[in-house]
């Protein structure tokens, strides 16, 4: 905000300087053509006095405007700090979020919920049966991948469940005498 005021001040100074040059040029041109003494505009002292008065008025008005603007900014700052009492150092609380941790946490909780639902559905559907889920569920488990990189851990779990299923199926299908 201060840089905006600074740029505005520079702009005003440039405009004021260009006005002074143009007035000086017109004074020089008007002095080459003498005007009658009864004309008050032809008097160079009168022009300089009017010019100084207008410059002073403009500068005074602009200074008053800047002072009122600073006062408004200060009051706004005080109101903001009063609202945030303990969080004065935190400027943009609504934008603060640790995206990676939140995303990983959300995905983990979602996958845990899905796994719990699948397990309950399997228990309800598979009571009394001794076989394991169909091949489709195992293929889905192989394709599923966790966001935080625990793919290898899940792969080991799936492979262990496949090996256990094959072993139990082998135990159930073979006769006791064939096992020795």
From Swiss-Prot:
What does the entry give for GO biological process?
adenylate cyclase-activating G protein-coupled receptor signaling pathway; adenylate cyclase-modulating G protein-coupled receptor signaling pathway; cellular response to glucagon stimulus; gluconeogenesis; glucose homeostasis; lactate biosynthetic process; lipid biosynthetic process; negative regulation of apoptotic process
Signal peptide from the UniProt entry: 1-20
Which residues get removed as pro-piece?
84-89, 131-145
Key words of the record = Amidation, Cleavage on pair of basic residues, Hormone, Phosphoprotein, Secreted, Signal
Tissue expression, as annotated, is: Glucagon is secreted in the A cells of the islets of Langerhans. GLP-1, GLP-2, oxyntomodulin and glicentin are secreted from enteroendocrine cells throughout the gastrointestinal tract.
Which modifications occur after translation, per UniProt?
Proglucagon is post-translationally processed in a tissue-specific manner in pancreatic A cells and intestinal L cells. In pancreatic A cells, the major bioactive hormone is glucagon cleaved by PCSK2/PC2. In the intestinal L cells PCSK1/PC1 liberates GLP-1, GLP-2, glicentin and oxyntomodulin. GLP-1 is further N-terminally truncated by post-translational processing in the intestinal L cells resulting in GLP-1(7-37) GLP-1-(7-36)amide. The C-terminal amidation is neither important for the metabolism of GLP-1 nor for its effects on the endocrine pancreas.
Biased composition range(s): Polar residues: 25-35
Record-annotated site: Cleavage: 52-53, 83-84, 91-92, 97-98, 130-131, 145-146
User: Under what conditions is it induced?
Assistant: Glucagon release is stimulated by hypoglycemia and inhibited by hyperglycemia, insulin, and somatostatin. GLP-1 and GLP-2 are induced in response to nutrient ingestion.
Where is the protein localized? Secreted
Region Disordered: start-end pairs: 25-59
| UniProt family annotation | Belongs to the glucagon family.
Which protein is depicted?
Pro-glucagon
Q: Which gene encodes it?
A: GCG
């Amino acid at each position: 905000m201060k840089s905006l005021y600074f740029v505005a001040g520079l702009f005003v100074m440039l405009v004021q300087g260009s006005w002074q040059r143009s007035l000086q040029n017109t004074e020089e041109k008007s002095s080459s053509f003498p005007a009658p003494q009864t004309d008050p505009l032809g008097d160079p002292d009168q022009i300089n006095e009017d010019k100084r008065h207008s410059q002073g008025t403009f500068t005074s008005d602009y200074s008053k405007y800047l002072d009122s603007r600073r006062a408004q900014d200060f009051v706004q700052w005080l109101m903001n700090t009063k609202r945030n009492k303990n969080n004065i150092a935190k400027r943009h609380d609504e934008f603060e979020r640790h995206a990676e941790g939140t995303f990983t946490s959300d995905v983990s909780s979602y996958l845990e919920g899905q796994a719990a639902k699948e397990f309950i559905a399997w228990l309800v559907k598979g009571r009394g049966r001794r076989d394991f889920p169909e091949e489709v569920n195992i293929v889905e488990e192989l394709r599923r991948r966790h966001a935080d990189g625990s793919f290898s851990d899940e792969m080991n779990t799936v492979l262990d469940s496949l090996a256990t299923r094959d072993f139990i199926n082998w135990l159930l299908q073979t006769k006791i005498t064939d096992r020795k």
